[in-house]
């Protein structure tokens, strides 16, 4: 088996780094929305995981039933978080496979 040229390996590594950085920028520039209760509660989450807005339909605001609202908020947050994880996997996953092409060094 022929060893790959070190300059080739470095060039490939630099390309991978640039692609990873671009994917990270795309993720950070994205906002995902998680909803619960058929849209009664929604949470917008930025690519860095910070919540940027929460929308609550007045129909679910009931002082006698705070638990339902809490459950809806948790559900909307969980959905937004899951969407963000899926986005990161879609953007970064294919790039991690590129390490196989670096001469088997990784």
Curated annotation (Swiss-Prot):
The keyword Electron transport does not apply. This is Nucleoid-associated protein DIP0260. Keywords: Cytoplasm, DNA-binding. Belongs to the YbaB/EbfC family. GO terms for molecular function: DNA binding. The keyword Cytoplasm applies. It comes from the Bacteria. InterPro entries: YbaB-like_sf (IPR036894), YbaB/EbfC (IPR004401). Pfam families: YbaB_DNA_bd. Homodimer. It is found in: Cytoplasm, Nucleoid. It comes from Corynebacterium diphtheriae (strain ATCC 700971 / NCTC 13129 / Biotype gravis). Binds to DNA and alters its conformation. May be involved in regulation of gene expression, nucleoid organization and DNA protection. GO terms for cellular component: bacterial nucleoid; cytosol.
